Amino acid sequence: MIRNFVISLRSTALLWILTALIYPAIVLVIGQLVFPYQANGSLITDSQGQVVGSALIGQTFTEEGYFWSRPSAINYSEGADASPTGISGASNLAPSNPDLLSRIEAEAQRLEDNAVQPTADLLYSSGSGLDPHISPAAAQAQFDRVAKARSIPPQELQSLITKHTEGRFLGIFGEPGVNVLTLNLALDNR
Amino acid sequence: MLQGFVQIALILAILVATAPLLGRYMARVFLGQSTWLDKIARPLESLIFAGSGITKHPSMGATQYVSAALISNLVMGVFVFLILMFQGSLPLNPTGLAAPSWDLALHTAISFVTNTNQQHYSGETTYTYFSQAGALGFLMFTSAATGIAVAIAFIRGLTGQAIGNFYQDLVLSITRILLPISLVGAILLLVAGVPETLAGPAQVTTLEGATQWIARGPVAHFEIIKELGENGGGFFGINSAHPFENPNNFANLLETVIMMVIPAGLIITYGIMAGNPEQGWLIFWMVFILYGILIAIAAVGEFQGNPLINQILGETQPNLEGKEVRFGWVLTALWAVSTTGTMCGAVNGMHDSLMPPGGFVTLSDLFLQIIWGGQGTGTAYLFVFLILTVFLTGLMVGRTPEFLGRKIEKREIVLASLILLIHPIAILIPTAITLAFPDTLAGISNPGFHGISQVAYEYASAAANNGSGFEGLADNTLWWNLSASFSLIAGRYVPIVALIFLADGMARKQPVPETSGTLHTDTTLFTGITAGAIIILGALTFLPILVLGPVAEAFNLV
């Protein structure tokens, strides 16, 4: 009993050093030295060199000249609620919850008022609340509005959308998605 | 829809290709044969053994083994509880987080030491980098290793060998299996875009001028052991749906396969260690078929979407509530079935927002516990079901039941029943108590039948040591933290103790020579009967909950 206790204490200490100190330190050093962009959160900058976000994290867009993101239960970790740690979260509404239906009815109305034909991903809120993507169909639904607001030739806008669409992995796994932030940043930088 | 099922088929093919490789490797490790890691691992192991005061590795008796497992888990749990309670004074706390409430810290420590990783908190707002990497990340290795060690001891006992030395198997599981794979996997995840930094959250001004706080941290090394060790506790609140935990479909593929590869591989390991690979493969395919059926149910449900919302859309669209665009309906459904089946508990989409078939399947996974099953323990439960089936079929034909040439007697059946019965006890009794006080205790966030699922799911997840949840539930309360802790402990340690005594007892029995009347367990017929026994026993116990929860909700939606 006592012997077991002593062995447990000593092995806990040694395994802790191995798995909670040495192992993370190795990954941290490799990350910071070899892959600093990814290791620090894939932060991207605008034309002035100002950090405007992360290529992997979505943002809220409301202006006519931007593509809009999906609904987020946490407002894309923006504003006072997110300070200082940053947050993530989902609605966790059940399919049978009346709140889901009324929220989606309101969202569909808002989109239709702005001449956007609702797609599933634009009505349903995302899992992380930070989803950087919309479906290609959702981008097409907003095409005319953005083209008009920015007076951008349709071919140019289409090629920008294509450029910022991430396809399936190996052409098979997952669903294609248009990265809203990098697309909007590219629109600003034209 | 076809494209979706092609994705599922390919991922399952990858699993079938990789799990036996790992299974064979694990068998080599625990049979003491040489592997290509010897040169690096052996000096490291000698150092750990010498430093821990383990000079020889005699096989332990059941009592000795159990006390070693329980005491070491207790020491680790207390150590982590103390780190969590004093995190405010410890380093790597860039956002100045204070200590959590004692009951939350207690629940967290128990949840991680039991390989469950049920989280009544959001990582980014509650625990410091030191607590996450130094306390929780540590338990992710040791709790998974404890599970593997117990499974190996169980396999040894069943096949008539001495059960082995707990500390030796614990250390070998880490140095030979968990740590090497994690190191490679963490680097792959880094390349894919998962951060690994000690810098605090990035504060940025968005394109529209709002202020956004982007949580970061040492995620990559944490993420891979989270999946590999079937731990499932996210660095961030929203787990593997978070783009920093699971940024793209390369990462998602890696994480999906790696969470299943050890429990699937351990079945093959068993076949090799028992000298009967055929039996291993039969069980493998039995689980595979059950798994495939459950995937199909969940995936079709998500694909057909929510009828109420489809009316607004004017067409049938998949249910995307709580899902990420990049994963879509199919990879979220596959993940949901895999994570609840394997007791990983990580999520890449919200289970609370799954359609009723998805809720049905995830709950069924938690009730059955053998659709691959928990790290190590799942494989052991499979054999408990085999033993019970031998007993049932033996009764039918009036023979003394035997398994692997050893008689199944009263002691074995008592211990197997205990393993089987502790699960409903740890789920149904607290569920009943909690549902009796819906306003004060339950914290239900979704009305109607779904609320019953929320409460049952939380205890099922705790008792099965899974850790996923119907996360709308307001569960960071004194009641939930303490009552879920009861289910966590009962669901983990009662079966472990019973498994070890069962295995040790089997190992000490005189082998019975095989005769013409011996019931062979390595046949398709017997495996089919086992599958039937698993489903009937599971259904008899838990059908009322499934009917009151997801089934009723499904009828309500039409």
From Swiss-Prot, chain A:
| Role of this protein | Part of the high-affinity ATP-driven potassium transport (or Kdp) system, which catalyzes the hydrolysis of ATP coupled with the electrogenic transport of potassium into the cytoplasm. This subunit acts as a catalytic chaperone that increases the ATP-binding affinity of the ATP-hydrolyzing subunit KdpB by the formation of a transient KdpB/KdpC/ATP ternary complex.
GO CC annotation terms, alphabetical: plasma membrane
| Subcellular location per the Swiss-Prot or TrEMBL entry | Cell inner membrane
Q: Which PANTHER family match?
A: POTASSIUM-TRANSPORTING ATPASE C CHAIN, POTASSIUM-TRANSPORTING ATPASE KDPC SUBUNIT
Subunit and partners: The system is composed of three essential subunits: KdpA, KdpB and KdpC.
Q: Name its GO BP terms in alphabetical order.
A: potassium ion transmembrane transport
Keyword Ion transport in the entry? The reply is: yes
State any single GO MF term.
Answer: P-type potassium transmembrane transporter activity
Which InterPro entries does the record cross-reference, listed alphabetically? Answer: KdpC
**Keywords noted in UniProt:** ATP-binding, Cell inner membrane, Cell membrane, Ion transport, Membrane, Nucleotide-binding, Potassium, Potassium transport, Transmembrane, Transmembrane helix, Transport
**Membrane-related topology note:** Single-pass membrane protein
Q: Would you tell me the protein name for this molecule?
A: Potassium-transporting ATPase KdpC subunit
Family statement? Belongs to the KdpC family.
| Residue ranges crossing the lipid bilayer per the database entry | 15-35
In terms of domain of life, where is this protein from?
Bacteria
Coiled coil ranges (UniProt) are none
The record, for Pfam families, names: KdpC
Swiss-Prot record, chain B:
Q: Which domain of life, per UniProt?
A: Bacteria
Where does it live in the cell? Cell inner membrane
Query: What is the recorded membrane topology of this protein?
Result: Multi-pass membrane protein
Q: Which GO terms describe its molecular function?
A: P-type potassium transmembrane transporter activity; potassium ion binding
Transmembrane residue ranges: 2-22, 66-86, 135-155, 177-197, 253-273, 280-300, 327-347, 354-374, 378-398, 413-433, 482-502, 528-548
GO BP, sorted A to Z: potassium ion transmembrane transport
**Gene Ontology CC annotation, any one:** plasma membrane
Record's Pfam families?
KdpA (PF03814)
Q: Which InterPro entries match?
A: KdpA (IPR004623)
Q: Which UniProt keywords apply?
A: Cell inner membrane, Cell membrane, Ion transport, Membrane, Potassium, Potassium transport, Transmembrane, Transmembrane helix, Transport
The record ties this protein, via PANTHER family, to: POTASSIUM-TRANSPORTING ATPASE A CHAIN, POTASSIUM-TRANSPORTING ATPASE POTASSIUM-BINDING SUBUNIT
Q: How does it assemble?
A: The system is composed of three essential subunits: KdpA, KdpB and KdpC.
Sum up the protein's function in the record's words.
Part of the high-affinity ATP-driven potassium transport (or Kdp) system, which catalyzes the hydrolysis of ATP coupled with the electrogenic transport of potassium into the cytoplasm. This subunit binds the periplasmic potassium ions and delivers the ions to the membrane domain of KdpB through an intramembrane tunnel.
Q: State the similarity comment.
A: Belongs to the KdpA family.
What protein name is recorded for this chain? Potassium-transporting ATPase potassium-binding subunit
**Which organism is this protein's natural source?**
Synechocystis sp. (strain ATCC 27184 / PCC 6803 / Kazusa)
